[in-house]
A protein has these predicted regions:
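Catalytic core of Fe(II)/2-oxoglutarate
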Residues: 246-321
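Active-site-proximal segments of catalytic enzyme domains
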Residues: 185-188, 192-194, 232-252
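Active-site environment of non-heme Fe oxygenases that use a 2-His-1-carboxylate facial triad
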Residues: 4, 59-66, 221-227, 231-232, ...
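Non-heme Fe(II)-dependent double-stranded beta-helix
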Residues: 20, 27-196
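Short, conserved beta-strand element in jelly-roll/cupin
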Residues: 162, 196, 202-226, 236, ...
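Extracellular structured ligand-interaction cores
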Residues: 84, 168-170, 212-218, 228, ...
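Fe(II)/2-oxoglutarate
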Residues: 1-80, 339-350, 358-398
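C-terminal hydrophobic structural anchor segments
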Residues: 295, 302-381
């Protein structure tokens, strides 16, 4: 039961809603200027985004004091600064990045023969090509290439600067063809995948926390002129607490389109930014350039429970008892909802995006969704078991 769908944003700011959004307040937060004094270790600041020379970072990698200063500066950028940074020349081995790109394009071609194309969370299908879970797929196809590509000093350091150690890397290829239109501006995973009714369920502290659980990034596999549509960014927008609501509102999207910045990127450059930063892939207005990025979504190692609990097993076992108790009036509707929340898996991620494509929505159904539907429609136990087993079967990468 979504008891907070209509909650008012009050109680000393514990609860947020679209009513919490103020474009004037937003402007005061994002219309700032990053300076060399703010980020003295940056080699330059372009369009409000600090730029770093990856070769310098690698040379300093064994100097603990220097690296600690770099990492502290990057953390401040993501926390309350511009929200994005660029590593120039993050992969300088042209043969390596070309070979990895060729392997990923082979995967695209093979998957297209099977699926006909992948969905996208924030753009129309057909405007681009996707490889979900390119991290694992590259590893399995070309382990030596993967080993050289994945062993990247800048990726490790910037990940630890925001998430600490024990981070988890996932990658998703995005190739945008000539004429491919821009995405709508958005925030990203986790809360960027939720609608307003869902966002209202979470206190403001969790709105802050969401961005601390993930770091977004991308490795450029092609030279990207502005005309090819590199990622549009709105510096400092990650600092706006009500931003997950604001990103859904037309006046904020209009403001984004009037004030975003883009940076040209060279093949081998790396871009990293807060998932709460308002951003969107740009329009590829070229006639012949395929914009090719391997996106990185790097997650905190803390995003897990302490114990392994077989919730599918529990759901199937308790369901016939719960159904009988429901029919006999021994469980109220509210008690049934509490039982579902205590028993079944409520979060549908991580998932296999090759199977649970965003063409069918921002998020696939969870175990709780299945259990709720089963209780509502009085499914026989066999049908519930089949649905849960099918759900579990989709929870594999291959």
């Amino acid at each position: 039961m979504d008891r907070l769908k209509s909650v008012s944003p009050n109680d000393n700011g514990v609860w947020l809603g679209s009513e919490s959004c103020s474009l004037d307040e937003f402007r005061t937060m994002v219309e700032r200027k990053a300076t060399a004094a703010d980020y003295p270790l940056a080699d330059s600041i372009q369009r409000n985004v600090p730029i770093y020379d990856a070769a310098k970072i690698e040379k300093a990698a064994n100097d603990c004091d220097s690296i600690a200063r770099y990492m502290a500066e990057w953390h401040r950028i993501f926390l309350n600064g511009p929200g994005a940074l660029v590593f120039r020349g993050m992969i300088r081995d042209a043969a390596l990045i070309d070979a990895v790109g060729a392997a990923l394009k082979e995967i695209i071609a093979e998957e297209r023969l099977v699926t006909g194309g992948k969905g996208d969370h924030f753009a129309k299908a057909g405007a681009n090509a996707r490889v979900w879970n390119s991290h694992e797929k590259l590893c399995m196809r070309a382990p030596e290439l993967y080993a050289r590509y994945a062993a990247n000093e800048c990726v490790d350091l910037v990940s630890r600067s925001w998430l600490g150690p024990l981070y988890q890397i996932t990658c998703q290829v995005n190739v945008v063809y000539p004429g491919g239109m821009a995405q709508v501006p958005h925030r990203d995973y986790h809360m960027g995948f939720q609608d307003e009714a869902q966002l209202r369920q979470y206190p403001a502290t969790v709105h802050r926390l969401s961005a601390a659980l993930t770091l977004q990034g991308g490795i450029s596999h092609s030279d990207m002129s502005i005309e090819s549509g590199p990622t549009k960014l709105l510096p400092y927008s990650q600092t706006y607490l009500a931003g997950y609501f604001a990103a859904l509102r037309p006046e904020f999207r209009s403001y984004f389109e009037e004030h975003y910045v883009q940076l040209p990127l060279a093949k081998g450059d790396g871009l990293f930014f807060s998932p709460a930063l308002f951003h969107a892939a740009g329009t590829n207005s070229t006639a012949d350039v395929e914009r090719f990025v391997n996106l990185l979504q790097i997650g905190s190692g803390y995003g897990r429970s302490i114990e392994i609990v077989d919730r599918a097993r529990m759901t199937k076992h308790v369901y016939p008892t719960a159904l009988t108790m429901q029919e006999e009036g021994r469980l109220t509707p509210r008690e049934l909802e509490l039982l579902v929340a205590a028993t079944a898996e409520g979060y549908p991620f991580p998932c296999n995006l090759d199977i649970d494509s965003p063409l069918s929505g921002m998020a696939p159904p969870s175990q709780q969704d299945i259990m709720r539907q089963a209780m509502s429609e009085r499914w026989p136990s066999g049908r519930l078991n089949e649905a849960i087993d099918a759900y579990q079967a989709r929870r594999t990468s291959h």
